[in-house]
Regions:
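Basic, alpha-helical interaction scaffolds
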Residues: 7-53, 512-585, 634, 638, ...
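Short helix-interrupting loop/turn segments at helix-coil junctions
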Residues: 53-63, 110-122, 151-156, 185-195, ...
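Short, conserved micro-motifs composed of acidic
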Residues: 401, 488-518, 619-625
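Catalytic palm subdomain of template-directed nucleic-acid polymerases
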Residues: 359-376, 412-413, 455-485, 500-503, ...
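Conserved pre-catalytic core of RNA-dependent polymerases
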Residues: 174-175, 182, 202, 206-431
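Short, conserved catalytic/metal-binding micro-motifs enriched in Asp/Glu and His
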Residues: 23, 27, 111, 182, ...
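Arg/Lys-enriched, amphipathic patches
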Residues: 1-168, 206, 210
Length: 659
């Protein structure tokens, strides 16, 4: 839908009035028992029709799907130019043709100017989004933004191979194969022996009342604009641009859902979009799937998530930093670097086992998940509602503009669901508690005998030990206990680092020996056994070079101002270069390498060559930059300030004083 049009206040008001009228009609119908709106399913169907109807009537649909940044105003000007061109072609006399060509020249000029303005606005918006992603440390989103700006999306292969390796050429066969692939991927084998997990003796202080209007409004505001709609075709903007009306409607709907303890069937359905990765695009395994779920359903999930995290977050261990407020990858990377550096300084043996789980989010047994939620004190009412959103959940794959046959998903967290990350954290937390319960197999962390067993970021686990025996014991216990929840360790991607160790025996799993390495890319940063950061800086320089080259068309574009180009450089190139720089141990030589890279790229963007005799200081002033050394130092002090303001139990804060 054309939600860019609601920036026009008159259109926005028309949209809200139409929605109000439709919702009022729905409310009047609800008072008529014959219309059977007393169930959440019927009420939802009528509500969906109201939203879609208002969007269709007032806004209409986009005509230019391949270039979404082109505004409706530009599309109108392009159509006007096309009509004028037809007039030129139909002209019968030279005089008529000259007059028509003059009009066409003006129409062409207006269309080009409008498109150029759209492109500038789009680049500015992408730069803003890139800055936000960089500030959050979300490198995946930043990479996707870079690819959009570069305009170099991989074309998905028309033909794919079946399990036997034969090419499938018909769309029907391909859709069937895609459904078969994702059905296998999203339905992992159950654990051989499920654990007996007792429920908490007392529930956490989590409200089990129906969602309030304030909660609904807050959840709607948290929705990200520009995201795709789910099976119900209701985009986030439909709710955000009719805040009061949507809040009232969802309040009535959620009340019915809360009473009956279940959600509409359509909310249990997901549409899978295929995103190509590296490698042979004829192979299904070289794609990842993104599930599109109902946006109103996400509002309910957001409310439940807020209630759960507010009460249950403190139950998680301090070692876990994934998907939690005021914690980041930098905390874990810095802590691990300090541990390695101090171990070398004190000539202390150290084992680090970087664990990788195979299809982690998709493999958790759901019955175990419900039991763990009750074990952590989540009230039965909340668990029941979440459970019912999973019961009967199905997916369909979008292929060639068509949908595959639906298939049921019976294991793991739902892809695209806001609740999945935190539910996964509880499972990993329970597993690690069982692994380390009553054990002292970690590294000495205090003078009072306290030990640090592991560093966790969601499913990225780094097990720590001083001896081979302790690391081997802990690894085997993790393998066994994780298996009871459905989690399986991927031996091929699990790696061990050791330093100053007398034993040469390998660390093993039931499936074989774990490979030993001298460096490992941990949470995006290269960690080496020598404790240095030179390898990481080299890797960041290579990644930043690739990012800069991908945006070559941006640097050459005459329609974009230098200010916009500098913003894009800062958000999409410089942030890639300086990712994790607050954890670096820099020298003058390493700082110079980083500065040379930045200077060279800034000179190209600003069109400055060596003959212009522009000093580096003047270059930085023109580009609004500080030196690389000052920037890195500032990032370090920002992280240190943030860390020391946290509680005494913070692992990263303790690491600053650990020796």
């Amino acid at each position: 839908f054309l939600f860019a049009e609601v920036t026009n206040e008159q259109i926005a008001e028309t949209f809200r009035i139409l929605l109000t009228n439709k919702f009022q009609a729905l409310s009047d119908l609800g008072r008529d028992q014959e219309n059977n709106l007393d169930t959440y399913e019927h009420f939802w169907e009528k509500s969906k029709t109201a939203w879609n109807g208002a969007c269709e009537e007032v806004l209409g649909r986009r005509k230019c799907q391949d270039k979404p940044w082109i505004s409706e105003n530009s599309i109108k000007k392009i159509e006007e130019r096309k009509k004028v061109k037809e007039t030129v072609n139909r002209a019968k006399t030279r005089q008529q043709k000259q007059a028509a060509q003059q009009i066409y020249h003006e129409a062409h000029k207006e269309a080009r100017t409008s498109i150029r303005n759209d492109k500038r606005a789009y680049a500015e918006e992408m730069a803003r989004m890139g800055e936000e992603a960089a500030a959050k440390g979300n490198m995946r989103e930043l990479y996707e933004i870079t690819r959009k700006l570069a305009g170099k999306w991989k074309a998905t292969s028309g033909s794919i191979r079946d399990q036997a390796g034969s090419l499938l050429t018909t769309q029907q066969d391909q859709a069937k194969r895609w459904a078969e692939y994702f059905e296998t991927l999203l339905n992992q084998p159950p654990p051989t022996g499920k654990p007996n997990i007792p429920a908490a003796t007392e529930d956490l202080d989590i409200s089990c009342d129906k969602p309030t209007r304030a909660e609904i409004k807050k959840a709607i505001k948290a929705l990200k604009s520009g995201k795709s709609a789910g099976p119900d075709n209701i985009p986030p903007e439909a709710l955000k641009h009719s805040m009061e009306e949507s809040t009232e409607l969802l309040h009535s709907l959620f009340e019915k859902i809360w009473q009956e303890g279940d959600v509409p069937k359509e909310w249990k359905e997901g549409y899978i979009v295929k995103i190509p990765k590296k490698g042979d695009l004829h192979e299904c395994s070289n794609y990842r799937g993104i599930s599109l779920l109902s946006v109103p359903g996400k509002v309910l999930n957001r409310i439940i998530l807020e209630r759960i995290t507010l009460a249950a977050d403190h139950r998680l261990t301090e070692q876990q930093a994934g998907f939690r407020k005021h914690r980041s990858c930098s905390d874990q990377i810095t802590t691990l670097r300090i541990i390695i550096e101090q171990s070398r300084e004190w000539n202390s043996s150290l084992y680090v086992n970087f664990i990788d789980f195979e299809k982690a989010f998709d493999s958790i047994d759901r019955e175990v998940l419900w039991a763990i939620m009750r074990h952590y004190g989540i009230p039965e009412k909340i668990v029941s509602i979440i459970k019912n959103t999973y019961v009967g959940a199905t997916c369909r794959v979008i292929h060639g503009g068509q949908l595959s046959e639906p298939f049921e998903v019976k294991t793991g967290g739902r892809q695209g669901c806001l609740l999945t990350p935190f539910l996964f954290l509880m499972v990993v937390d329970w597993v690690m508690r069982k692994v380390t319960e009553g054990k002292k197999t970690g590294i000495q962390w205090s003078l009072w005998g306290e030990q640090l067993e592991d560093l966790d970021f969601a499913d990225d686990l780094a097990l720590l030990s001083h001896t081979h025996q302790h690391m081997q014991e802990k690894t085997r216990r993790l393998e066994q206990i994780a298996a009871t929840t459905g989690l399986r360790i991927n031996r091929a991607k699990t790696k061990v680092m050791r330093m100053i160790c007398k034993s040469t025996q390998p660390i093993t799993l039931n499936t074989g020996i774990i490979e030993e390495v001298s460096s490992f890319t941990y949470l995006g940063s290269v960690v080496s056994i020598d404790g240095g950061t030179e390898a990481d800086i080299k890797a960041r320089l290579n990644k930043a070079t690739v990012a800069f080259r991908m945006l070559d068309n941006i640097w050459k574009a005459k329609s974009l101002s230098k200010r916009t180009k500098i913003r894009i450089f800062n958000s999409n190139v410089k942030s890639v270069l300086l990712y994790g720089s607050e954890t670096w141990r820099t020298t003058k030589a390493l700082s110079k390498k980083v500065q040379v890279f930045i200077n060279k790229r800034l000179r190209r963007i600003l069109g400055i060559n060596w003959q212009d005799r522009v000093t580096n200081e003047e270059l930085w002033a023109r580009a609004g930059q500080n030196s690389a050394e000052d920037t890195i130092r500032g990032r370090k002090w920002t992280w240190i300030g943030h860390t020391i303001r946290r509680g005494q139990g913070c692992i990263a804060r303790q690491a600053l004083k650990w020796t």
